[in-house]
Design a protein with these regions (language model features):
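A short, flexible loop at the N-terminus of ABC-type nucleotide-binding domains that lies
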Residues: 1-9, 16, 57-61
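The feature captures the beta-strand-to-loop junction immediately N-terminal to the Walker
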Residues: 23-25
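Helix N-cap at the start of a conserved alpha-helix in ABC-type nucleotide-binding domains
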Residues: 28, 155-157
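Helix-to-loop junction immediately C-terminal to a conserved catalytic motif
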Residues: 38
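Conserved ABC transporter NBD signature motif
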Residues: 46-58, 66-67
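ABC-family P-loop ATPase nucleotide-binding domains
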Residues: 75-132
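Catalytic Walker B motif of ABC-type/P-loop ATPase nucleotide-binding domains
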Residues: 144-148
Length: 203
C-alpha cells in the first residue's frame, strides 16, 4: 500500500446482533478501514463512533482505552511474542482489560484444546487463531473485529470459528465485523456484506 492511499466517503455501520462481512481485493482498504475504526490512525476528515461515542486517534486517551476495552481483535497471524507459552499470555493481555475474567480464559483454553505449556511459535495457524479468540472473548467484548482471521485455516477450523461467531451474536447485544475473502464463510455467517474497492465502499 502506498503512502498516498486514502479512504473516501467510507460509511460503515455494525448493528448489535449482526455479523457484517467486509470484502475487497488486497490493497482495497479493508485493513486501513479497520485501523481507522479502532482509532489507530489519525483521520483527515470524518468521524468514528463506537458504541455511540466518538473515537479516534485525537480522542482523549482514557476515552480510547475504555472504548477499545469493549473490542476484541483477531488477526490473520498470531501477534503474541513467539517465545511465550500459552499459559503466559494471560499475564500479558489481562492487565489491559479491567473486565478480564480469568475463569473465562481458562475455560476457553481448555475448550479450544490449547496446551498451556505450548509456545506461541509452535502453534498451528488454527491454534493461534483460537488463542487470539480466547483472549478476545475473555474481557466481555461487545464487538469482535476479525481481519482475515480465517485465511489459511483448514475447513474444520473455519467452521469452528464461524460457530463461535454465531454464538457470540446470538444474544442480540454483540456484533462482529468479519473481513474475509472467503465468500463461503460470509455466505454461512454474515447477515450482510460490505465491499470496498480502492478506498471507497462499493456496496
Amino acid at each position: 500500500m502506498s503512502d498516498r492511499f486514502s479512504l473516501r466517503d467510507v460509511t460503515l455501520a455494525v448493528e448489535p446482533g449482526q455479523i457484517v462481512g467486509f470484502v475487497g481485493a488486497n490493497g482495497a482498504g479493508k485493513t486501513t478501514t479497520i485501523r481507522a475504526a479502532l482509532g489507530l490512525i489519525k483521520l483527515d476528515a470524518g468521524e468514528v463512533h463506537l458504541f455511540g461515542q466518538r473515537c479516534g486517534a485525537d480522542a482523549p486517551d482514557e476515552s480510547q482505552r475504555h472504548l477499545r476495552s469493549r473490542i476484541g481483535l483477531v488477526l490473520d497471524t498470531c501477534p503474541f511474542p513467539s517465545t511465550l507459552k500459552v499459559g503466559q499470555i494471560e499475564a500479558l493481555v489481562g492487565p489491559a482489560y479491567p473486565t478480564w475474567d480469568r475463569e473465562t480464559f481458562a475455560g476457553f483454553i481448555k475448550r479450544f484444546g490449547l496446551d498451556p505449556k505450548a509456545k506461541v511459535k509452535d502453534l498451528s495457524r488454527g491454534m493461534g487463531m483460537k488463542l487470539q479468540l480466547a483472549c478476545a472473548l475473555s474481557h466481555q467484548a461487545k464487538l469482535l473485529v476479525l481481519d482475515e482471521a480465517t485465511a489459511g485455516l483448514d475447513p474444520m477450523a473455519r467452521e469452528e470459528l464461524l460457530d463461535e461467531l454465531l454464538a457470540f451474536v446470538a444474544d442480540g447485544q454483540r456484533s462482529v465485523l468479519l473481513s474475509s475473502h472467503i465468500t463461503s464463510d460470509l455466505d454461512r455467517a454474515a447477515d450482510r456484506v460490505i465491499c470496498i474497492d480502492n478506498g471507497s465502499i462499493v456496496f
